[in-house]
């Protein structure tokens, strides 16, 4: 059967994370149930996990389907009807048989949305309300993040990782309408890494943590801060792959 790479978007506030939980709703379970209702029992393979409350606009998942290319448009439309309203397939691409996007992804990117203005009841699950502080100090701290670093002091306590070394390729802070947006792009991320980084950067902006202290924690010398920002403002927004994974160049809309 053809292996497809699906790019998903989902409302993380409706799920207890992307991975299957014992008794709680998850993105993977919702997708598996949607596929099963169409007679597809394929294993679903995610490019990476997102925790409870974290959203995605471009999560990558692979699975096999018993449909020929001419039927993929119909398949996507029918599947989205079953996934509505919290989960949606945006695009489908054919890839080489059996590939796992977790191991094939060359980079991932996240955005974190913050508002200094009071939020409406409808926005509180999608944006974090907090005081930013000094933008220039935060930008200086974010420049320190670019490159290879040992993020051992910016990960979830107790999480098991073969290596805590990651390459931060791009990161910056910018203004979008009434929001502040933190952008991070790396070859991979540790659990809670971005939320811990945002929490520390906000401490720097407010003058509660010096640039030198931030640098020491980044160099895994000493922990000054270990409280992560809330999950609600965090979005997985991009997963990139080498061109060699694609079976064909044409894409299905």
Swiss-Prot record:
One of its GO terms (biological process) is tRNA pseudouridine synthesis. SUPFAM superfamilies: Pseudouridine synthase. The active site is at residue 51. Substrate binds at residue 110. The keyword tRNA processing applies. One of its GO terms (molecular function) is tRNA pseudouridine(38-40) synthase activity. It holds the Pfam family PseudoU_synth_1. Keywords: Isomerase, tRNA processing. It comes from the Bacteria. It is an enzyme of class 5 (isomerase). Transmembrane segments: none annotated. It catalyses: uridine(38/39/40) in tRNA = pseudouridine(38/39/40) in tRNA. Its EC number is 5.4.99.12. Coiled coil: none annotated. CDD domains: PseudoU_synth_EcTruA. The keyword tRNA processing applies. Homodimer. PANTHER family: PSEUDOURIDYLATE SYNTHASE, TRNA PSEUDOURIDINE SYNTHASE-LIKE 1. Formation of pseudouridine at positions 38, 39 and 40 in the anticodon stem and loop of transfer RNAs. HAMAP family: TruA. Belongs to the tRNA pseudouridine synthase TruA family. This is tRNA pseudouridine synthase A. It comes from Wolinella succinogenes (strain ATCC 29543 / DSM 1740 / CCUG 13145 / JCM 31913 / LMG 7466 / NCTC 11488 / FDC 602W).
């Amino acid at each position: 059967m053809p292996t497809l790479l699906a790019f998903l978007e989902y409302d993380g506030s409706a799920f207890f994370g992307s991975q299957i939980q014992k008794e709680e709703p998850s993105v993977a379970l919702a997708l598996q149930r949607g596929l099963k209702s169409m007679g597809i029992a394929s294993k679903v393979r995610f490019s990476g996990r997102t925790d409870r409350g974290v959203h995605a606009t471009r999560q990558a998942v692979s699975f096999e389907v018993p449909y020929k290319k001419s039927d993929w448009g119909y398949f996507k439309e029918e599947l989205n009807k079953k996934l509505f309203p919290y989960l949606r397939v945006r695009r489908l691409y054919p890839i080489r048989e059996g590939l796992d996007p977790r191991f094939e992804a060359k980079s991932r990117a996240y955005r974190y949305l913050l508002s200094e203005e009071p939020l409406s009841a409808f926005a509180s699950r999608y944006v974090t309300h907090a005081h930013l502080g000094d933008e220039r100090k935060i930008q200086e701290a974010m420049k320190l993040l670019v490159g290879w670093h040992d993020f051992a002091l910016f990960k979830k306590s107790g999480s098991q990782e073969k290596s805590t070394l990651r390459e931060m390729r791009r990161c910056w802070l910018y203004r979008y309408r009434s929001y502040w947006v933190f952008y991070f792009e790396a070859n991979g991320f540790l659990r809670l890494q971005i939320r811990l980084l945002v929490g520390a950067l906000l401490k720097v902006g407010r003058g509660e943590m010096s640039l030198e202290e931030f640098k020491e924690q980044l160099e895994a010398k000493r922990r000054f801060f270990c409280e992560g920002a809330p999950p609600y403002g965090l979005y997985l927004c991009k997963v990139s792959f080498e061109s060699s994974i694609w079976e064909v160049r044409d894409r299905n809309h």
